[in-house]
Every structure is written in C-alpha cells, then in structure tokens.
Amino acid sequence: MIFYVHGFNSSKESSTGKMLAEQSGRPVVCLGYDCSRPFKKNLEKLSLEAWKDMDGFDVIVGTSLGGFYACEMARELQTCAVVFNPAMKPKSQLKKFLGGNVNFATGEKWMFTDDILDSYPEELKAPKGLPVKAYASREDEVLPGNGELVQKAFNDFEWVDSGHRVADFRKYIDEIKKYENILGVSPNE
C-alpha cells in the first residue's frame, strides 16, 4: 500500500496526493494532519490511520513536513519511506510561519502558535536500519540549505533538479514501487 503525507499548510485533499495516485496507477491512501495541533498528536493520528490499512507491502511517501512525518512514521511502524525535501530542522524551519496562515488546499484560516512550534523536535533523525530513500532539491526555495542536511542524514539519497514542490512523480514511481515491495514480493494486481 502506498501512503502519502502532505506538507505544511496543506491537507490530504491536496493535488500532490491525487497526482501520486494517478501517476502510479495504484491506490494511494492520503493521510492528513492538522498543522494547528501538536507534533506528537499528529504523529499518533497519522500512524494509527496508516496502521489500519497496512498490508505488509507498505511505503510511506512524504513531501516537506510530510517527509519529516513519513520518517517518524516509518520508525514507529517499522516500514519503508520515500521522502522528498523532508523538513530536517522543523522547529527552526517552521518559525517563519508563526501567526496567521491560510491552508493552501482548503483555504481555511488558522493560527500557528509558539506552543505548536515548540512541540516539534529540533531535527529529524533519519531512521536507521529501515529502507528509506530521500530526495532533495538543490533549488529549494522554501527550505534553503535543507538539501545538504538531507544528504548528510540519509544513506540512500539523490539530488533532484526541481524546486521544493514535487510537480511530477513519474520519474520516481519505479523507486516508490520498489520500496513498497522491498521484500521482493509483488502484490497481485
């Protein structure tokens, strides 16, 4: 099963998750979290939602803050992940969003508070002993300098020639499917 976790200030109804499903030709479970809630509550909710649908051939795909959550979920659920521009230092990288925000996907207005910011860890520790593939952009306009942090943290790493947002998953689909079937068994289609 492919799971997708959206980035900051978005939702599970985002176009990115839908694009992943269309381009992979596979069912994708888009998982959502509320950016106005504390990190641990979001992680617990995401992990529980994924656990209910896991079939043993699972990969969690995440973009930006969703990449951060995907790594934390992979560690908690002992499964694979493929992440794109994962937020490596969420506490400092999210600071610029303190105050009023408008959700990109829903248009809903909300407040990002100091208490919520403080609920995030200082940095992402790449899951050790788990198959995790990380991609990072050299031209990340949202998280400048993040790519170098990703490169240092992940053993299975690749640079991409794009901006922060994943505009097309097609060139990554084979890798995502490989991680979904890391045990070498293909689910019947």
For each predicted feature, which ranges?
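Short hydrophobic segments within beta-strands
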Residues: 4-8, 61, 135-137
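A general structural motif
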Residues: 25, 55-57, 78, 129-131
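Aromatic pocket-lining residues of Rossmann-like dinucleotide-binding sites
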Residues: 73-77
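The alpha/beta-hydrolase serine catalytic core
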Residues: 80-189
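Active-site catalytic motif of lipid deacylating hydrolases and related acyltransferases
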Residues: 1-54
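Gly/Ala-rich beta-loop-alpha elbow adjacent to hydrolase catalytic centers
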Residues: 61-70
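Conserved alpha/beta-hydrolase fold motif
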Residues: 59-60, 81
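Active-site phosphate/pyrophosphate- and oxyanion-stabilizing loops and adjacent acidic/basic residues
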Residues: 18, 71, 148-149
